[in-house]
Amino acid sequence: MDDSKVVGGKVKKPGKRGRKPAKIDLKAKLERSRQSARECRARKKLRYQYLEELVSSRERAICALREELEMYKQWCMAMDQGKIPSEIKALLTGEEQNKSQQNSSRHTKAGKTDANSNSW
């Protein structure tokens, strides 16, 4: 007796179950693979460019911080010798001027708000 079954007018032979893979166009599959590889290489190139830019910007930041640290070391050595560096004097006088400007502007604003509050 034959093990094949008739279902819907078609003869099914026993064997693997499930969908049978359709005939794959090998040229199309190869082209898709090549395209995917091209896209992968392009993404990799962009990623490496981004990382290189990130590294160079961090290196520039490190150099700037080293210069700033060296400047602060020089200031500390000068202050240990009893000298006040001119940069620190400029910073201090600049802060004093800013404080005096802020205080004068606060008094001016306070005067305006008091005048406005008493006008009703």
Curated annotation (Swiss-Prot):
Residues 1-24, 93-120 are annotated as: Disordered. One of its GO terms (biological process) is positive regulation of lipid biosynthetic process. Residues 23-86 form the bZIP domain. Residues 10-21 have a biased composition (Basic residues). Keywords: Activator, Cell cycle, Differentiation, DNA-binding, Nucleus, Phosphoprotein, Transcription, Transcription regulation, Tumor suppressor. Phosphorylated by AMPK. It is found in: Nucleus. Residues 62-69 are annotated as: Leucine-zipper. GO terms for cellular component: chromatin; nucleus. Disulfide bonds: none annotated. It comes from the Eukaryota. Its main location: nucleus. InterPro entries: bZIP (IPR004827), bZIP_sf (IPR046347), CREBL2/REPTOR-BP (IPR039250). GO terms for molecular function: DNA binding; DNA-binding transcription factor activity; DNA-binding transcription factor activity, RNA polymerase II-specific. Interacts with CREB1; regulates CREB1 phosphorylation, stability and transcriptional activity. Probable regulator of CREB1 transcriptional activity which is involved in adipose cells differentiation. May also play a regulatory role in the cell cycle. Identification in a chromosomal region frequently deleted in various cancers suggests that it might act as a tumor suppressor. Belongs to the bZIP family. ATF subfamily. This is cAMP-responsive element-binding protein-like 2. It comes from Homo sapiens.
